[in-house]
């Protein structure tokens, strides 16, 4: 757990944003500068809604709250990454050629945090999801494979893709979205 951090989880409409706004207000009333307050969420939609409500309530701008970001944007900016450092559609296409799987999709840039996220489809997408989930959860690959319960997938292919992905990222000095979070946590 991070010192001075609070984790707020819940389904849509349960008051997460309201609770966070109240906490931000309390900190501002204590004299904490807005640039010293961070709110992190999984989605750009949630952060966009939060920033809009916070700016409206406190009569401030988005620039006043530089640490209201998605998890990935926090890692991306915290690590000082540039677009060239991140696995792109072209990188996944090269990797797919090496592995004889498809990582189809397009790069889509978030308007809220400027991070380009490849949306994956194709025969390799499920494998990448399992690999990334293993990193996020800090769990073994075999656990995540079994958890998926997809009998159309091959564990040996999963291991091959993970190994090739790690090698490719190492040789090209690229990171993927799971790396952004994991590496940022390592230095934080």
Predicted feature locations:
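Short coil/turn linker and secondary-structure boundary residues
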Residues: 32, 69, 87-90, 153, ...
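P-loop NTPase Walker
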Residues: 1-85
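Conserved phosphoryl-transfer catalytic core
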Residues: 88-115
């Amino acid at each position: 757990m991070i010192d001075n951090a609070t984790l707020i989880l819940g389904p849509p409409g349960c008051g997460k944003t309201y609770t966070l706004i109240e906490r931000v207000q309390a900190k501002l009333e204590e004299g904490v500068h807005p640039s010293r307050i961070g709110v992190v969420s999984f989605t750009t939609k949630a952060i966009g809604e939060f920033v809009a409500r916070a700016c409206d309530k406190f009569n401030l701008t988005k620039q006043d709250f530089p640490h209201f970001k998605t998890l990935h944007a926090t890692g991306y900016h915290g690590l000082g990454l540039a677009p060239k450092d991140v696995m792109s559609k072209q990188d996944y296409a090269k990797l797919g050629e090496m592995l004889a799987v498809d990582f189809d999709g397009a790069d889509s840039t978030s308007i809220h945090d400027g991070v380009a996220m490849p949306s994956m489809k194709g025969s390799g997408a499920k494998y990448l999801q399992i690999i990334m989930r293993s990193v996020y959860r800090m769990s073994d690959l075999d656990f995540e494979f079994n958890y998926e319960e997809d009998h159309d997938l091959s564990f040996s292919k999963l291991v091959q893709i993970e190994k090739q992905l790690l090698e490719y990222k190492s040789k090209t000095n690229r990171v993927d979205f799971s790396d952004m979070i994991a590496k940022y946590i390592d230095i934080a």
